[in-house]
Design a protein with these regions (language model features):
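The conserved beta-strand core of Leucine-Rich Repeat
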Residues: 1-290
Length: 290
């Protein structure tokens, strides 16, 4: 029997290699591994030795893995990292090279090390999700620039755009012209005192989006004014009339007035918006579900 998926439970204290002694070949085609990094280090090392075929790795972090472990998965195509709010440097990701990585999902992981990780990929990334990590304007600008320089084939992106870096969105749209879905977290989600200029953002989107991009998700504290939405939809109709928008909005406490729904309904009838949904929680939808 050949196994393709393996899930190792939390606090697994047995030496896994002893348990599978004599049947190692059954794991030689393993493609997916899910485990907690609190398991016995020898187990991870043993798996590395026999599981060169692993393409998707899901780690539940309670202590930092070593660079040696992660760098051993040279064929890795999907990496999901979740930091459960424990303060860690995550320097194990710096200078890590995963040349075939296609999907990167990171929650609570320092931006600096994620920037380094993306910088050491070979242009195969098609999906990036980064959230729940506070960072400054400089770090935010750096990761946006790294993404549009290193990820020409990107199709889906979830990322915070700090207000002063919003002009970088133009470069991202131009360089990542295979984008299908874009999930923007606006800075006022983190700081309610920040005022977002949606006219600039919507102009950048309507002027520079490729024909492939039609799935949009906005997470903000304060909704755009009606005239900003009108400006956006009217410009989209002129530039990309054959690509109606799938739009989701997520608000932080503040509710739309009915006039916003009435406006969007008008553009649905005109064929500019294909589908619209609004929610108060980011957990209502899957990140790249429209």
């Amino acid at each position: 029997m050949k196994f393709t998926h393996l899930y190792i439970p939390h606090k697994f204290n047995y030496y896994f290699m002893d348990l599978i002694s004599g049947v190692e070949k059954g794991f030689s085609k393993l493609e997916f591994l899910s485990c907690n990094t609190n398991i016995n280090d020898d187990t991870l090392i043993g798996l590395v030795e026999i599981c060169k075929s692993i393409k998707e790795l899901e780690l539940y972090i309670t202590k930092q893995p070593t660079t040696k472990i992660l760098s051993s998965f040279i064929n890795l195509k999907s990496l999901e990292l979740y930091d459960n709010s424990r303060p860690m440097s995550w320097n194990c990701l710096e200078n890590l090279s995963l040349p075939y990585l296609q999907i990167l999902k990171a929650t609570g992981i320092p931006i600096k090390v994620l920037t380094s990780l993306i910088d050491h990929t070979n242009g195969h990334l098609i999906e990036i999700k980064i959230d729940h990590i506070s960072h400054n304007e400089i770090s935010n600008k750096k990761i946006i620039q790294t993404i549009y320089k290193k990820c020409p084939n990107l199709e889906y992106l979830k990322l915070l755009f700090i207000n002063n870096n919003i002009l970088e969105l133009r470069e991202l749209l131009i360089n990542c012209n295979h984008l299908i879905g874009l999930y923007i977290i606006f800075e006022d989600v983190w700081d309610v005192n920040v005022m977002i200029d949606y006219n600039i953002i919507f102009k950048i989107l309507s002027d520079n989006s490729s024909i492939s991009l039609f799935k949009l998700k906005f997470y903000y504290h304060r909704e755009p004014e009606l005239k900003s939405f009108e400006f956006f939809f009217d410009n989209w109709k002129i530039r990309i009339p054959m690509r109606p928008i799938l739009l989701q909005t997520i608000q932080y406490h503040v509710l739309y007035g009915s006039e916003h729904f009435d406006l969007i309904e008008k553009y649905k009838k005109n064929g500019i918006v294909k589908k619209y949904e609004n929610a108060l929680s980011e957990n209502t939808f899957q990140d790249f579900e429209w």
